[in-house]
Structures are given as C-alpha cells and as structure tokens.
Amino acid sequence: SGCGGVGSAIAWGLCEAGILQLALHDQNPATLQQLHNRLAAHFPHVQLSDLPTTLTGLDLVVNGSPAGMTGFASLPLPQALLETLPAATHVADVVTAPIVTPLLAFARDRGCTIQTGPEMALAQMKLMGQFIGAIPQEQGAAA
C-alpha cells in the first residue's frame, strides 16, 4: 500500500529483484496509475494489478504509506481484506513510529513474520553508508 516515493522505490526494487506479480494500492488513483504505468513500461514481465480481493497466496505485504503513523489512518488496507491475511505472509511497514504499527500488530497476531520501519531504515542507512564510502563494503553486512 502506498505508491508515493517510498512505495514506488519498494515496488521498483521488487520488480528489479525478479518478482512475477505485484498488486498496488494507493488512496490517490492518479498516484497509483502513474506508478503502474512506469512499472509496466520498464518491467513488462511483471503482472501488475490493483488491490486484490484476498491476501491469500501473497508472500509479502508492504505498507509504504503513512497509514499507522500518529495522525493518519491506522490501517493501510480495508479490515475485511486484512482478515484474509495468511500466517505464511511476511508483512513489512515503513512507518518508524510507532515501531509496531497497527498493521504489524495485526499481522503478528495472525502469526505472520514482520519487519518494522526502524529495521527497514537501519538496512537503508547501511547501504547509504556504503554508497557514500562512509562504511567499507566488507563492514556493511556486519554493521
């Protein structure tokens, strides 16, 4: 969920990594369509779709929107859709505060593995440090 800057970067990275299917969701239809068009042009092998009717069969659900952050809607997807979330799905959220967002708490209660926003941010900081030369490449994995 979320097709802005963060969500776009995550979607692009997943497509570069070789996923075959990607479902996109954003509250703004124009933002969703722009990302869909860019991904379709660069990754024609990826089957793109809008919000699915079920989460059954998905390997990964990522919130790349501010949903769950203080002052924003608590869940990035409709509750009825989240009720279809299987325990085998990994759920990640980019929101850094609170550490465990309502989405992650819901997923954890369903038995899913989760990745918090701070965990995702730390991984990006290591990569950025390597990119600018502040962290030697060999230390990046252990840092």
Where are the predicted features?
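Active-site flanking residues adjacent to catalytic metal/cofactor-binding acidic residues
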Residues: 1, 25, 92
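NAD(P)-binding Rossmann-fold cofactor-contacting core
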Residues: 19-39
